[in-house]
Swiss-Prot record:
NCBIfam families: bL25_bact_ctc (TIGR00731), PRK05618.1-2 (NF004128)
Organism: Rhodopseudomonas palustris (strain ATCC BAA-98 / CGA009)
Gene name for this UniProt entry: rplY
Gene Ontology molecular functions: 5S rRNA binding; structural constituent of ribosome
Gene Ontology biological-process entries: translation
PANTHER family for the chain: RIBOSOMAL PROTEIN L25/GLN-TRNA SYNTHETASE, ANTI-CODON-BINDING DOMAIN-CONTAINING PROTEIN, RIBOSOMAL PROTEIN L25_GLN-TRNA SYNTHETASE, ANTI-CODON-BINDING DOMAIN-CONTAINING PROTEIN
Protein family membership: Belongs to the bacterial ribosomal protein bL25 family. CTC subfamily.
Subunit structure as annotated in this protein's UniProt entry: Part of the 50S ribosomal subunit; part of the 5S rRNA/L5/L18/L25 subcomplex. Contacts the 5S rRNA. Binds to the 5S rRNA independently of L5 and L18.
Keywords of the record: Ribonucleoprotein, Ribosomal protein, RNA-binding, rRNA-binding
GO cellular component terms listed in the entry, alphabetical order: cytosolic large ribosomal subunit
Function: This is one of the proteins that binds to the 5S RNA in the ribosome where it forms part of the central protuberance.
InterPro entries: Rbsml_bL25/Gln-tRNA_synth_N, Ribosomal_bL25/Gln-tRNA_synth, Ribosomal_bL25_b-dom, Ribosomal_bL25_C, Ribosomal_bL25_long, Ribosomal_L25_dom, Ribosomal_uL5_bac-type
Protein name, UniProt field: Large ribosomal subunit protein bL25
HAMAP family: Ribosomal_bL25_CTC
């Protein structure tokens, strides 16, 4: 079950750049609640509280109850903008969640068993192809992260999204079987592997040559042709 956090907001009676700048000077961040076939609702939230929520992580996969004039609006953040210089939030968008809503989310990928993977023990290196997974999930069952067990991966082996059991009701939005992680061989691995394969063949050649004279020596001499009768 998705945990729901509460966020207090106030209505924003005026729109436009001038009104937005006034909100920011007052220590508030302008935003909007939209979706679910309802009219957009301009709001503002306290900048300090919003910044803490963003810094806590997983902001875009967290469901909130935005409290506005005593009424709760079930939402999920869809986007936010940061000041390019001072790096604090200057705008936020919330998507209104209706009953039974299903949404697309980008969920972090957590890897388990990195240190014990056979490929790592043999000198390979993990190449994490993607750090997030694009999923479609019920609003009440959004996973905070997806865990992938890589403890059995060897050199040259990849883990795909189809190798992971997703939570009930959650599915990938990609038509392709996304590669999540692979183990890259160490430098010179292919050359060493080829040399190792060639060594037994090279050793077998002299042995085969040595067996040939011995086999010839053991072979019985050919019988002389019988004399013709006169």
């Amino acid at each position: 079950m998705t945990s729901v956090l509460e966020l207090k907001a106030t209505a924003r009676p005026k729109s436009g750049k001038g009104a937005a700048r006034a909100e920011r000077r007052a220590g508030r961040v302008p935003g909007v609640i939209y979706g679910d076939n309802q009219s957009p609702l301009p709001i503002s939230v306290e900048e300090k509280e919003l910044r803490l929520r963003i810094l806590a992580g997983r902001f875009l996969t967290t469901v909130f109850d935005v409290v506005l004039d005593g009424k709760k609006h079930r939402v999920i953040p869809r986007d936010y903008h940061l000041d390019p210089v001072r790096d604090f939030p200057i705008h936020v968008d919330f998507l209104r969640l209706g009953a039974g809503a299903t949404i697309r989310v980008s969920v972090p990928l957590h890897l388990k068993g990195l240190e014990v993977a056979p490929g790592v023990k043999r000198g390979g290196t993990f190449n994490i192809v993607t750090h997030t997974v694009e999923l479609e999930a019920p609003a009440e069952n959004i996973p905070q992260f997806i865990e992938a067990d890589v403890s059995t991966l060897d050199i040259g082996v990849s883990l795909h999204l189809s190798d992971i059991a997703l939570p009930t009701g959650v599915k990938s939005v990609s038509r392709d079987d996304v590669t999540l992680v692979t183990i890259v061989p160490p430098s010179g691995y292919n050359e060493d592997k080829a040399a190792a394969g060639a060594a037994p063949a090279a050793a077998a050649a002299p042995a085969a040559a040595a067996k040939a004279p011995a086999a010839a020596a053991k072979a019985p001499a050919a019988a002389a042709p019988a004399a013709k009768k006169k």
